[in-house]
């Protein structure tokens, strides 16, 4: 393949790609790592780390419910008029619960975005710094970024829109937490190897990786882990397609708590 239609430069091991929602796995891993360091509990509520949310309904939602998309009413995307940090705060301050937290799954960038922001606040660093200076190095990912450095721009592949025009990921509210990671193929192979062989990581990071694999909720044949969605192995193409259906991605669906952990899983994002 080529990196860009503009110069027809071939894709190689240095090419940097936008990961989209795969970024959510890194956000979940950061939260699991913060938990392993005793910086937060998944049963905590947002105002413990963001006091301005103390009197808002979002404070009735736990961090676990945020990372598993079960807040009760957070939508797929922020409204178009929410752009600045202050607007993000005001959005959460004025948000209202619709369904009981923990009982309905609604895939949501604001939900995992807030989880990532709370994680960073618990670690007392900006979210971008947490990923670029702590999480990526622990995976030994040396060419993975939130903000692609100037000297790496020549390796940064373009995406293409429906009109076949080159585009970059659009900036947005809590974008780094939900869809902001860019990486190379060799780095992503390191990431996959760490998840397939977590015992090779040092003890605190092994604990964080394994935490992201734990299933918490079940929606049909799909189990919601942290960042990942998993399925019993073996599974079928039809089951995987169902998990990407409009109903699952765009709507609120009742879930049941997962009490058993499958030994063999198919991981999906």
Feature map (PLM): residue ranges:
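Short, surface-exposed loop or secondary-structure junction motifs
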Residues: 2, 56-268
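Short active-site loop at a secondary-structure junction
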Residues: 6-65, 97-111, 176-179
């Amino acid at each position: 393949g080529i990196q860009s239609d503009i110069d027809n430069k071939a894709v190689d091991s240095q090419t940097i790609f936008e990961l989209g929602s795969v970024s959510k796995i890194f956000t979940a891993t950061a939260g699991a790592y913060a938990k392993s360091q005793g910086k937060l509990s998944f049963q905590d509520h947002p105002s413990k780390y963001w006091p301005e949310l103390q009197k808002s309904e979002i404070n009735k939602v736990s961090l676990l419910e945020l990372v598993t998309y079960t807040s009760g009413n957070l939508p797929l995307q922020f409204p178009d008029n929410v752009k600045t940090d202050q607007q993000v705060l005001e959005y959460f301050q004025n948000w209202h619960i619709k369904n009981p937290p923990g009982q309905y799954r609604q895939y949501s960038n604001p939900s995992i975005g807030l989880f990532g922001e709370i994680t960073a606040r618990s670690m007392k660093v900006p979210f971008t710094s947490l990923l670029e200076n702590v999480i990526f190095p622990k995976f030994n990912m040396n060419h993975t970024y939130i903000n692609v450095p100037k000297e790496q721009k020549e390796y940064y592949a373009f995406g293409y829109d429906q009109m076949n025009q080159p585009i970059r990921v659009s900036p947005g509210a809590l974008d780094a937490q939900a869809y902001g990671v860019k990486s190379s193929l060799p780095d992503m192979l390191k990431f996959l190897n760490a998840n397939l062989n977590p015992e090779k990581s040092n003890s605190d990071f092994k604990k964080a990786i394994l935490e992201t694999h734990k299933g918490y909720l079940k929606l049909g044949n799909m189990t919601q882990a942290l960042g990942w969605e998993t399925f019993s192995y073996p599974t079928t193409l039809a089951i995987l397609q169902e998990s990407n259906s409009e109903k699952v991605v765009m709507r609120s669906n009742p879930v049941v708590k997962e009490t058993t952990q499958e030994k063999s899983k198919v991981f999906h994002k």
